[in-house]
Regions:
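Beta-propeller blade termini and top-face loops
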Residues: 1-374
């Protein structure tokens, strides 16, 4: 169960003793929560299956036999209190984390989806009828996050999933193999975020960066790795305990903390690499990882121990970067978007509550017009 992430209780409007416990399975209580029984559901890999994990629930106030549940794969509808289900497949509710493209013609779009793996599909097609579902290919399993083609040969590429899992895949055979960085020594336990930082080197197609509490680099497409940074997080032991106030442990890696969320190598200068963490640290190297500077105190208005969700190194100036931070996990839904033009010596907040409503997750600077930012 994941009370820190998702779990809801719903009450039947006709019967206050009937409660629904909404998390991975769905269970119901008929005695005000003293006991719960599972609601039968067909697994998602079978015809008309209902996809966990469940995040939303609605009971028809006029008919308690009719309810709708929402999860990582869409919605499920029942008219007979869960005895049978309808799973509508025409609602576009896929949740993408990261997107990339290759250089094929037509070029392909790649994306990692919440609890639905990593996929690729054509951006357009030469055939009549448009882009069909069957044109999309499943590449790497698990919770899909980063996925990026190998531009030397788009048959191959890289995909990430939960717990820091990193794979190199083969589109033709469907096979993929783990290339996750190993522990640097027997006494060092790596801390990978649920959505661990990944970046390709814009100067070398064989080089990749991956983040635990360290920045890891490979120069041979994942065959070997080396650590090029110290621990860039606060490394607070109190945030790394297996027990958090008595809450039921998820035991899936989603509770990992003090980890790197963002890595951004500069497309202008190969020695410049930015990194951001889930505990509010902003770090920079200007010598390819030999030395790192903590820039956190230079970012005025940065909430303490917030999530540095994304850093984008500018394609126009080596010292410029954009940074997205969010703090909604602490009830702060303000958008935090910062920009530096001097290697992090000073930062300007580019978006606030007067310009953008809701917290921010990502930023993109236009590749042609530097003043156009999304």
């Amino acid at each position: 169960n994941r009370p820190f992430y998702f779990q809801e209780l719903a009450v039947d409007t006709k019967d206050p003793n009937r409660l629904y416990n909404i998390y991975q399975p769905l269970s119901v209580s008929y005695d005000g929560g003293k006991s719960f029984d599972p609601v039968p559901m067909i697994p998602a890999d079978e015809t008309k299956g209902i996809h966990a994990d469940f995040h939303a629930f609605w009971v028809n106030p006029a008919d308690p036999q009719h309810f709708i549940i929402g999860g990582d794969g869409g919605i499920g509808i029942t008219q007979d209190h869960g005895k049978s289900w309808y799973f509508p497949e025409t609602i576009p509710v896929a949740q993408f984390y990261h997107i990339s493209v290759d250089n094929d013609r037509p070029y392909n779009v790649y994306g990692g989806m919440q609890d639905n793996g990593n996929w690729s599909g054509p951006a357009y097609t030469w055939k009549r009828g448009g882009i069909r579902t069957l044109y999309w290919q499943y590449l790497v399993g698990g919770d899909g996050f980063y996925i990026a083609p190998d531009l030397d040969n788009s048959r191959y590429g890289y995909g990430t999933s939960q717990n820091g899992s990193l794979y190199r895949y083969d589109k033709l055979t469907g096979y993929y193999v783990s290339i996750k960085p190993p522990q640097p020594d027997l006494n060092t336990r790596l801390r990978f975020n649920w959505n661990a930082a990944f970046a390709k080197d814009p100067h070398d197609e064989s080089s990749l960066y991956y983040g635990s509490q360290f920045v890891h680099v490979t120069h041979d497409k994942g065959a070997t790795w080396e650590v090029i940074s110290p621990d860039l997080t606060t490394n607070n032991p109190a945030h790394q305990k297996p027990d958090y106030g008595g809450l039921t442990l998820d035991v899936s890696g989603a509770e990992m903390y003090n980890s790197i969320l963002a890595i951004a190598p500069s497309p202008i200068n190969e020695n410049v690499i930015w990194a951001g963490t889930d505990d509010g640290q902003v770090q920079l190297t200007r010598d390819g990882g030999k030395t790192w500077k903590n820039l956190t105190k230079q970012v005025k208005g940065l909430p303490n121990e917030s999530w540095v969700a994304q850093i984008k190194a500018s394609p126009y100036t080596a010292g410029a970067a954009w940074m997205v931070v969010n703090n909604y996990r602490k009830g702060d839904y303000s958008p935090y978007l910062f920009k530096t033009e001097n290697f992090g010596k000073s930062w300007t907040r580019m978006a606030d509550d007067t310009k953008v409503k809701g917290y921010a997750l990502s930023v993109v600077q236009d590749p042609v017009e530097p003043n156009l930012v999304f």
